[in-house]
């Protein structure tokens, strides 16, 4: 089965076929680094990561570009408020974005590019637009796009803009469909604002031109997939299409993939409601990065996700169940031999996961077969039906699953330490929960090191050196490692 994706441009599910045989070129709108990213932002970034991982697993060579918007209205306003240059202000939040991605196991794109490194290209492209009469200069030195010159304007957002506000202008970056006007490509400088000197004069780019230029520079005038959150369909992505296609006369992106918003406890996320959470907020509250990632992946990207704290607890239980299963099949002394039934179950699991992801990245559907496998193999192991020769096929099924979901081989303790260090540096030590502090203590305590300590604990008990075995158990407990005695020996798990 081939990958099928819902294409916002056509309004239907289509079979994905790259423009070039085995290479996928895709562009994702990245962060606007004016503040710490919230969990709604990271739902979108995890959707991008899921598609990226699945394309690679499916054998495609990938060229994935993500931008960093490091100049826009909000950034300029906030930098001025804090008495900093744009560069000084955004450096902090760009670093924070990368730290949050690392915590959530979001892979880096092949290229992560800053808007401010491409301002000359933006200015030259605007000059081309002016020469083609699809852009015009105003008295103050700003440039605007003539939406009346692009008859297909509205084809992405499915709204007919014909004759609407003809010739009127809007100079803010974000606005509603009913306020559609000629939009700003280049903004003349205001006193005290950041500005750049270019072939079209002094000023700064509008938000929409940034992504057109960076995507076409690295991926070409036509590329395979453009991704973002549903809030970007209009005006941002609509304007990207208009700018790009009015000059190149080529289809800008073949597929447009948009993820839905999320709710928090059934309500729209809002600082005024007290339900606005960043990734590091959740980590400091004691929630594992793997649980956050799992919950954000548990609902298909085109469905609204209701992010709840009960859901986070259930996600933690689910991840622990998977990790405990993996640990069991790696460490349990199964009898020699092979049970063909177990190998068949493992192979069927791999097939079902792929089929679910081919079905418009249906992550919820992909989770079901892995938990069916865990249930059935645990029951078989309890009955003595799993053999040593079955372990490789079971581990392969887990590996294929985790190439996409990325929650099994994660050291949550190591992922948590950055948030604790950040809280201490920012004077927010009071926000560090006891659970988070405990996890941070285990930073660097790898599975291999835990295994070595567990083996030493078992050897000490066998030698009746109970003082040493108790000391090891206490050391592990302090680092969030729980030991369990079973008929097959000692097992361990992280809290």
Swiss-Prot record:
It is found in: Cytoplasm. One of its GO terms (molecular function) is ATP binding. Zn(2+) binds at residues 29, 211, 236, 240. It catalyses: tRNA(Cys) + L-cysteine + ATP = L-cysteinyl-tRNA(Cys) + AMP + diphosphate. InterPro entries: Cys-tRNA-ligase, Cys-tRNA-synt_Ia_DALR, Cys-tRNA/MSH_ligase, Rossmann-like_a/b/a_fold, tRNA-synt_1_cat_dom, tRNAsynth_Ia_anticodon-bd. Gene3D superfamilies: Cysteine-tRNA ligase, C-terminal anti-codon recognition domain (1.20.120.1910), HUPs (3.40.50.620). Binds 1 zinc ion per subunit. Its cofactor is Zn(2+). A motif ('KMSKS' region) lies at residues 268-272. Its EC number is 6.1.1.16. It is an enzyme of class 6 (ligase). Keywords: Aminoacyl-tRNA synthetase, ATP-binding, Cytoplasm, Ligase, Metal-binding, Nucleotide-binding, Protein biosynthesis, Zinc. Pfam families: DALR_2 (PF09190), tRNA-synt_1e (PF01406). GO terms for cellular component: cytosol. The keyword Iron does not apply. A motif ('HIGH' region) lies at residues 31-41. GO terms for biological process: cysteinyl-tRNA aminoacylation. ATP binds at residue 271. It comes from the Bacteria. Monomer. Belongs to the class-I aminoacyl-tRNA synthetase family. PANTHER family: CYSTEINE--TRNA LIGASE, CYTOPLASMIC, CYSTEINYL-TRNA SYNTHETASE. This is Cysteine--tRNA ligase.
């Amino acid at each position: 089965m081939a990958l099928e994706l819902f294409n916002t441009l056509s309004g239907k599910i289509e079979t994905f076929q790259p423009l070039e045989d085995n290479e996928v070129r895709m562009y994702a709108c990245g962060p606007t680094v004016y503040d710490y990213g919230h969990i709604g932002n990271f739902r979108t970034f995890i959707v991008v990561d899921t598609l990226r991982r699945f394309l690679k697993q499916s054998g495609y060579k990938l060229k994935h570009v993500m931008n960093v918007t490091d100049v826009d209205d909000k950034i300029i306003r906030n930098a001025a408020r804090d008495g900093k240059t744009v560069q000084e202000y955004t450096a902090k939040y760009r670093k924070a974005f990368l730290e949050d991605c690392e915590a959530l196991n979001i892979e880096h794109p092949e290229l992560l590019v800053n808007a401010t490194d491409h301002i000359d290209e933006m200015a030259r492209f605007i000059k081309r637009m002016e020469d083609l009469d699809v852009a015009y200069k105003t008295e103050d030195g700003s440039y605007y796009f003539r939406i009346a010159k692009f008859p297909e304007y509205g084809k992405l957002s499915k709204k007919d803009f014909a004759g609407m506000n003809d010739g009127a202008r809007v100079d803010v970056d974000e606005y509603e469909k009913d306020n559609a006007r000629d939009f700003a490509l280049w903004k003349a400088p205001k006193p005290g604002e950041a500005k750049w000197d270019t072939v079209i004069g002094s000023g700064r780019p509008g938000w929409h031109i940034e992504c057109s230029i960076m995507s076409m520079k690295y991926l070409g005038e036509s590329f395979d997939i453009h991704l973002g959150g549903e809030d970007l369909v209009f005006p941002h992505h609509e304007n990207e299409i208009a700018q790009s296609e009015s000059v190149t006369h080529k289809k800008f992106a073949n597929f447009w993939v948009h993820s839905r918003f999320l709710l928090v406890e059934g309500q729209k996320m809002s600082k005024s409601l007290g339900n606005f959470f960043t990734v590091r907020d959740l980590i400091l509250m004691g929630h594992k990065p793997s649980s956050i990632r799992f919950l954000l992946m548990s609902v298909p990207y085109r469905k609204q996700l209701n992010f709840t704290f009960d859901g986070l607890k259930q996600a933690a239980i689910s991840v622990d169940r998977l990790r405990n299963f993996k640990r069991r099949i790696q460490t349990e002394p199964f009898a020699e031999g092979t049970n063909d039934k177990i190998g068949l179950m493992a192979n069927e699991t791999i097939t079902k996961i792929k089929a679910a992801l081919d079905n418009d990245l249906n992550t919820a559907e992909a989770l079901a077969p892995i938990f069916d496998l865990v249930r059935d193999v645990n029951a078989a192991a309890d009955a003595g039906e799993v053999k040593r020769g079955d372990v490789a096929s079971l581990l392969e099924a887990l590996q294929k699953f985790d190439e996409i979901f990325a929650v099994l081989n994660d050291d949550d303790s190591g992922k948590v330490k950055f948030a604790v260090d950040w809280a201490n540096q920012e004077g927010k030590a009071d926000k560090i929960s006891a659970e988070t502090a405990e996890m941070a203590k285990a930073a660097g305590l790898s599975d291999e090191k835990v295994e070595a300590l567990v083996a030493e604990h078992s050897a000490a008990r066998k030698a009746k050196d109970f003082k040493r075995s108790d000391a090891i158990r206490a050391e592990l407990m302090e680092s969030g490692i729980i030991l369990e005695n079973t008929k097959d020996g000692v097992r361990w798990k992280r809290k």
